[in-house]
Amino acid sequence: MRLWKAVVVTLAFMSVDICVTTAIYVFSHLDRSLLEDIRHFNIFDSVLDLWAACLYRSCLLLGATIGVAKNSALGPRRLRASWLVITLVCLFVGIYAMVKLLLFSEVRRPIRDPWFWALFVWTYISLGASFLLWWLLSTVRPGTQALEPGAATEAEGFPGSGRPPPEQASGATLQKLLSYTKPDVAFLVAASFFLIVAALGETFLPYYTGRAIDGIVIQKSMDQFSTAVVIVCLLAIGSSFAAGIRGGIFTLIFARLNIRLRNCLFRSLVSQETSFFDENRTGDLISRLTSDTTMVSDLVSQNINVFLRNTVKVTGVVVFMFSLSWQLSLVTFMGFPIIMMVSNIYGKYYKRLSKEVQNALARASNTAEETISAMKTVRSFANEEEEAEVYLRKLQQVYKLNRKEAAAYMYYVWGSGLTLLVVQVSILYYGGHLVISGQMTSGNLIAFIIYEFVLGDCMESVGSVYSGLMQGVGAAEKVFEFIDRQPTMVHDGSLAPDHLEGRVDFENVTFTYRTRPHTQVLQNVSFSLSPGKVTALVGPSGSGKSSCVNILENFYPLEGGRVLLDGKPISAYDHKYLHRVISLVSQEPVLFARSITDNISYGLPTVPFEMVVEAAQKANAHGFIMELQDGYSTETGEKGAQLSGGQKQRVAMARALVRNPPVLILDEATSALDAESEYLIQQAIHGNLQKHTVLIIAHRLSTVEHAHLIVVLDKGRVVQQGTHQQLLAQGGLYAKLVQRQMLGLQPAADFTAGHNEPVANGSHKA
């Protein structure tokens, strides 16, 4: 809001507030002057103190207005920082007005003074307006012309207001979370019905308990006592039955919510671009998918159930409390604003802690996942104890945050518990006074005390609900952060021709990984893959060979240049079609915890078993598969753990061949095979794939030398192209690599794909 509007509105209200309060005070004290009222002030009879409270809040608003007017940049920030001050002032004045009403009721029974009621009502209207005006002044936009020059420069660096406040963000997250329950509207209606029935039944129990006591103590009638007891029994049975149904339905609703959330999150994750998985660790993503979604559904289901139940109960309890004694009801409600404020402060702090705990748990989960998935490596270095220590340190970080949560909860229980104790003692004392003075019966007092305990339990539950909801909302924000994330690389191509020759052209390709923005992996790389020909990529480790494979698979966007498939950019092809016509067999193939048949036919909707067997035979996998106990139905285990390295590579080769792909990529695909198996695979490549485009990355000379074209890469550039004999005749890098390998002077890594280029979850190959 603009500065001048906020100032005018605030000053106008202050004038109206002072005039109205003063007029009411004057008309209510026509029989004595102001000085006489001050000299002989009587708290039971005078409203001078309420008039003074009006002047005090007007002074606060005037000071806030001047501060914002003199410095429209820093002033609103200071007002936001002093929210607690205005809250406490309004809270104190509101409670004092209730006390004033009770004091007046002791000397004027009933209170029929219209001026007192006018001032009492106006006090609460003015308090609400003062609170809103304080908020209005705190929202004056920085940069609005101020009365004092230089104020804007003083506030440089003031944070923008584009981000919604935490309360608004939490409310939006909760609303979004509940929107996922729309398919269960019928269940929600049924659960709400039984919730209302159960809550109303529980609400009537204290009332009829009081009737039973009055039947004994006052009427001394066994009939009235028996009738009240029967009603209490029926109410208890009915409410228990309804509560059971309510709980069961709510549990079902939020179990369905959990499934829905996990499904949406998983679908969002698998649709992200490949670089997303380079930047986010697997353990963090798994933590979001498992622990966070479970926490969201469990906490939200439990707390919404409790919140709705207690809201209905509070409504009924308040009605009965006022019907029994409005004076005791006012005493009761004096303490609840304090409890609500304490709950609000605690809830905000707990929400922040909850986010930190979830992040710490995700880091611990990532450490555990990394260690367990690489257990053979850990054991080969005898590093079990050190890994356990690392995991323990991560858990200790979680424990430190848990201690903060425990301390915060302890202080919250102290504050709310002491406030409730003060309220209960006040009710007991003042209620005894009302019974002795004949203003209420002993049965009504006992019923009221029971209602007060019920109300206290409800408010305590609502307080814990708030902290629980904040914890659930904190986890939900992280879940929705991934659900709502739009991939930066969208696979929206639509080309899916019936016939594809398989010609691939790299034209001046320049490429940089997002995780290494200052390092160009490929620089103006150009070469072609021809149909029916085998092309080999050769070069030292880190030269960019596997990056070419990643680009051909359309895993990453290009920085410059383009990659064409049959003359069309690969990004123009349909995602499923592209990966059906281009098949990759990597050095470390990944098999899924499924049968061998399912692994070979992975990604294809329907594949005849005969085609699976034929592909396995071409990959020299059929023999060992038939030797397994369950043959093609054998479960490969997690990541193919039940198979040897060579067996996994042959199954992966069969998975690629079953597609009969126009373009086949072999990235170190025979590195784990023995000489005989490699020979058979080579025969399959050169003998059965004449009409296919084959790209090979290999370190063995026997694999490379038979290629129709060899492309030599060095430091991201193409330095040589030609056949094996041509490149040897030219000399240069290729000849050096061959010579060193033949003489045993260079490790085989010279011809490898290099293990520094990005693959999933942050490991890089170059």
From Swiss-Prot:
Induction of synthesis: Not induced by interferon-gamma.
Domain spans labelled ABC transporter: 504-740
EC identifiers of the protein: 7.4.2.6
Pfam families per the UniProt record, alphabetical: ABC_membrane, ABC_tran
Tissue: Highly expressed in testis, and at moderate levels in brain, spinal cord, and thyroid. Not expressed in monocytes but strongly expressed during differentiation of monocytes to dendritic cells and macrophages.
GO cellular component, one term: membrane
Subcellular location: Lysosome membrane
Catalytic activity: a [oligopeptide](in) + ATP + H2O = a [oligopeptide](out) + ADP + phosphate + H(+)
Thermal dependence of activity, per record: Optimum temperature is 37 degrees Celsius.
Result for mutant: residue 17 to R: Loss of lysosomal localization. Does not affect lysosomal localization. Does not affect interaction between coreABCB9 and TMD0 domains. Does not affect interaction between coreABCB9 and TMD0 domains
Keywords in alphabetical order: ATP-binding, Lysosome, Membrane, Nucleotide-binding, Peptide transport, Protein transport, Translocase, Transmembrane, Transmembrane helix, Transport
Entry's Gene Ontology molecular function annotations: ABC-type oligopeptide transporter activity; ABC-type peptide transporter activity; ATP binding; ATP hydrolysis activity; protein homodimerization activity; transmembrane transporter activity
Site (Intramolecular salt bridge with Arg-57. Essential for the release from the ER): 17
Activity regulation as described: Transport activity is limited by threshold levels of luminal peptide. ATP hydrolysis is reduced in the presence of the spatial challenging 18-mer peptide by 50% and the branched 16-mer peptide by 75%. Transport rate of the longer peptides is strongly reduced.
Site feature (Important for the second trafficking step from the Golgi to the endosomal and lysosomal compartments) residues: 45, 49
Family per record: Belongs to the ABC transporter superfamily. ABCB family. MHC peptide exporter (TC 3.A.1.209) subfamily.
Name of the protein: ABC-type oligopeptide transporter ABCB9
Species whose genome carries this gene: Homo sapiens (Human)
